[in-house]
Structure formats: structure tokens, C-alpha cells
């Protein structure tokens, strides 16, 4: 009696040996989204901040799975990377953009996937950031032959749109420096730290980590944590007289911290109070990222640690419009598009331009 399986296996082997063609690999069992996502993240050089962003996306995918189960009755549904196409991407986009409504309609979504923060309406800027991460994952899957086709072919990526960056003028900073905070010593300390940040331009995470030993030959030296795994480049920012005077003022602070920092959340709240107390409360124009409409808001109400970084970049870029030169002081990648938003003509230059027309009348 012929053993059919063995006979078949031997003859299949003979066929591929004779033809010179490689024998197809045996298909492996279905790999879950989470397993693939873990592998994707393990192969990426991501800082802690970027990792957190990708983990937010993972949780969104899990909630999308629950949404499909609830809305379509597909109780066994799971997000199968191999089956994702443009149509599914459109559905995923709709879910993430309108998730705040879907979790109200289907409470089971959050029961199965508890989320600490409230889910709010999301605009195109947010969606653009999320889908850049989705695309990066599928690009990795395609390059590693996990999927046969790239699902983003024909998919229209959302566009980012930002208003002009809002930052303090040098006169504003001077007013803050001269403001009297003698009645609130804690606020005075935070004022000094904010002014220091306006003069060195580092991100809040790097600011909080600065140590006394990071001041070398009259300059602050640090490696930005946001890009340390992708581009471990030391940023060197010479300290001007204002920054140096603040370092000198707090040189006897116990421990190795450069300045007496507090938590970033309290720091941001204090910055708003600092501007208000200094009288920096004029209105500025902001763009609502959800409705894409502009609105006015007092500058102190939108002030934060990132405004200090924008103040550093904006005021230097007005004088030296060389992105590569400025990026050497900020830690941006060379050729970064982040500086495109700072190319607005200064208001004083605009006044000079329109004065040209006065001679025509």
C-alpha cells in the first residue's frame, strides 16, 4: 500500500530540484497585529517620546477592533495587517477622526479598552501625525514582505496646516526680565528659568535635565533627548549675558541641577501667570486645528515652555535667515522644515515697505 503523503512529498521535492526553482516556504500561522507592531517598534530607533506616540496609535487600533465588533456584529474581528487595503484605511481614518462620537454610541469600546484621557474631536493636523505613523508601520511591513502590496497607494494623506508661530518679541522678554516679582519669590525663580529658556532655546525635557556640569567654556552643551536615538548630536549654545547672569544667580542651589526646576506642568501654569503679571496680555491670532478657523486669544493664556523655544528660534531667525545655522543652536535636523513657519516678514519690515507708497501721493 502506497503512503500517499510521503510519496507526494518526495515527488514535490524532485520537481523543484529538477526545475532549479526554490521550493516555496511553508506559510506560517497568522501573526497578530500586536506581534508585528512589537517587532516594528523594536527595529525602529525611537526616543521615549516617539515610542509613546506609537503606543497611542496601538491603543487606537485596539479600539477600532472593538468598534468593528460592536458596529458590524463581527465578534471575532481582529485587525489583520495582511488584509488592510485603501478601503480599510478610509474606515480607520473615519473612526479615529470621529472616535469621540463612536465611543458615545458604543460604550463597549471603552469598557474593553479603558482610556485615561477623554477622547476629543480631532483635526487634520492631528490626523496627519497619526497617519504618518500608520504609513510608517505599513511601509515597514511592505519592505519586509509581510504584505504583498502597499495599502497607501491612492490613499490621500491629510495635510497639515499651521498658523504663524506665536512667540515673544525681544521687548516682551525685556519687560519680563524687569518686572517686579519680589512679592512672590517662587514665581521670580520660575520667571528666571523661563527667561533662561528664551535665551538657550532647548525643549522642556532637556531644560529639566540640565546639570551644572553641562556649562562648558561659557556655553550649555546637551544632546536633545527627542532625537538621541536617531541622531545623537551635541547641541552647543553659547550663553549670552542674560543667561549667564541667571546661571550665576543660582550657582549655589544645592545638588547638581543647573536651576531650581519644578514639574513641567506647574512650570507651564506659572509661565501664564508670569506673562499676565508682567502685563504681556495682548491678543494674538491662532488657528483652530479642528475647525481650521482663526480666533483671537490673549498671548498669556497660550504661553507655555514651548513658547520660550519659539521665542529663541523666532528672534534669531528674523536676523539670520539660515535654517542650518539656527538648527545648530536648536537641535533640529539640518534642512528641517520646522523653520518654514518663521519666514513671515517682520512687522517693522512691512511698515517700511508700505511707507514706499507714501511717496506716490
Where are these predicted regions, by residue range?
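N-terminal helical hairpins
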Residues: 1-50, 60
Amino acid at each position: 500500500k502506497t503512503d500517499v503523503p510521503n510519496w507526494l512529498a518526495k515527488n514535490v521535492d524532485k520537481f523543484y530540484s529538477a526545475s532549479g526553482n526554490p521550493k516555496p516556504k511553508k506559510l506560517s500561522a497568522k501573526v497578530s497585529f500586536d506581534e508585528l507592531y512589537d517587532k516594528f517598534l523594536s527595529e525602529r530607533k525611537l526616543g521615549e517620546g516617539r515610542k509613546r506616540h506609537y503606543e497611542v496609535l496601538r491603543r487606537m487600533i485596539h479600539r477600532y477592533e472593538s468598534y468593528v465588533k460592536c458596529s458590524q456584529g463581527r465578534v471575532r474581528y481582529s485587525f489583520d495587517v495582511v488584509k488592510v487595503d485603501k478601503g480599510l484605511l478610509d474606515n480607520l481614518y473615519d473612526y479615529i477622526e470621529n472616535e469621540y462620537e463612536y465611543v458615545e454610541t458604543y460604550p463597549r469600546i471603552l469598557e474593553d479598552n479603558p482610556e485615561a484621557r477623554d477622547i476629543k474631536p480631532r483635526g487634520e493636523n492631528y490626523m496627519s501625525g497619526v497617519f504618518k505613523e500608520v504609513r510608517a508601520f505599513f511601509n515597514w511591513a511592505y519592505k519586509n514582505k509581510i504584505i504583498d502590496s502597499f495599502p497607501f497607494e491612492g490613499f490621500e494623506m491629510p495635510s497639515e496646516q499651521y498658523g504663524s508661530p506665536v512667540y515673544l518679541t525681544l521687548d516682551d522678554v525685556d519687560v519680563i526680565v524687569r518686572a517686579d516679582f519680589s512679592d512672590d519669590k517662587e514665581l521670580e525663580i520660575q520667571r528666571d528659568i523661563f527667561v533662561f529658556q528664551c535665551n538657550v532655546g532647548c525643549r522642556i525635557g532637556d531644560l529639566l535635565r540640565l546639570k551644572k556640569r553641562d556649562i562648558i567654556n561659557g556655553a550649555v552643551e546637551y544632546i536633545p533627548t527627542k532625537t538621541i536615538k536617531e541622531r545623537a548630536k551635541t547641541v552647543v549654545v553659547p550663553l549670552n549675558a542674560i543667561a549667564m547672569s541667571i546661571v550665576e544667580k543660582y550657582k549655589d542651589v544645592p545638588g547638581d541641577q543647573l536651576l531650581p526646576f519644578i514639574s513641567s506642568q506647574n512650570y507651564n501654569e506659572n509661565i501664564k501667570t508670569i506673562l499676565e503679571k508682567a502685563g504681556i496680555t495682548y491678543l494674538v491670532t491662532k488657528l483652530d486645528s479642528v475647525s481650521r478657523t482663526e480666533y483671537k486669544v490673549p498671548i498669556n493664556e497660550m504661553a507655555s515652555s514651548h513658547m520660550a523655544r519659539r521665542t529663541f528660534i523666532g528672534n534669531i531667525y528674523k536676523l539670520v535667515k539660515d535654517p542650518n545655522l539656527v538648527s545648530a543652536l536648536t537641535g533640529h535636523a539640518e534642512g528641517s522644515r520646522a523653520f518654514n513657519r518663521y519666514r513671515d516678514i517682520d512687522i517693522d519690515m512691512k511698515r517700511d515697505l508700505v511707507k514706499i507708497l507714501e511717496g506716490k501721493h
